[in-house]
Amino acid sequence: GRQSIDKDDVKAVVDTLNSDLLTQGPKIAEFESLLADYCGAKYAVVLSNGTAALHLANIAIGVQRKTKVLTSPISFVATSNSVIYSGGSPVFCDIDEKTFNISPSEIKKIVAMNPDVSGIIPVHLGGLIADMESISRIANENGMWVIEDACHALGGQWTDSEGVERKVGD
């Protein structure tokens, strides 16, 4: 698809560029509040790009040297690079042939052979949400953490097996 940028968007950017507060002005706080509301989150913190966001998330969760992290090979390079930037090693997990997202059955196989894998970074490719119920269950059963790469799925939602509507990032 195409991006949706209208005249009001262009005016808002020009107004900000012409203001005295370019990088930490009131528009940042306004955008963070709107983004949090849109995603159903309590807070949102904007960064320069998705790579920086993933890198920060990896650092915050403790990725460091020798940390192994499962992720999809079908993604923008930032997903795996964020692990590398933090000192860890990405371990690529095959995808589901129907959704093109990381495959829970393949995650199970890799974790069984590599019990030292610390976490999973599923990518919601093209807005199609990965099987987060299965991925979360596998992570919980194995003492692993999950960071969702939701760059393609901001505000996305899915319904779990009990009929409960979930938001990306729950």
Locations of regions flagged by a protein language model:
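Phosphate-binding glycine-rich loop
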Residues: L21-K68, S82-Y85, F92-D94
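Glycine-/small-residue-rich active-site loops that bind phosphorylated ligands and cofactors
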Residues: I5, T23, S75, K98-T99, ...
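Active-site phosphate-binding strand-loop segment of PLP-dependent enzymes
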Residues: K98-V168
